[in-house]
């Protein structure tokens, strides 16, 4: 059981933690504005999720 916990933590460390953005919130919003995106909670079916805006729940939809 301990080996499963170890592999789960290792998997979390390798996949989830690097996916966090290192940009400050200001730069994340400016990046969305550069591509003429709109910050929304959820993107529609015909929109592309470009990344996160200032709040982590808001997505930049193009």
Swiss-Prot record:
Residues 1-21 form the signal peptide. Pfam families: Defensin_beta_2. The keyword Disulfide bond applies. This is Beta-defensin 110. Belongs to the beta-defensin family. The keyword Cell cycle does not apply. Has antibacterial activity. One of its GO terms (biological process) is defense response to bacterium. It comes from the Eukaryota. GO terms for cellular component: extracellular space. It is found in: Secreted. Transmembrane segments: none annotated. The gene is DEFB110. One of its GO terms (molecular function) is chemoattractant activity. Disulfide bonds join 32-60, 39-53, 43-61. Keywords: Antibiotic, Antimicrobial, Defensin, Disulfide bond, Secreted, Signal. InterPro entries: Beta_defensin_dom (IPR025933).
């Amino acid at each position: 059981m301990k080996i499963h916990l170890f592999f789960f933590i290792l998997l979390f460390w390798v996949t989830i933690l690097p996916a966090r953005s290192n940009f400050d919130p200001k730069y994340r919003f400016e990046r969305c504005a550069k591509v003429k995106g709109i910050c929304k909670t959820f993107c529609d079916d015909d929109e592309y999720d470009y990344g996160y805006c200032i709040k982590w729940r808001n997505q930049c939809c193009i």
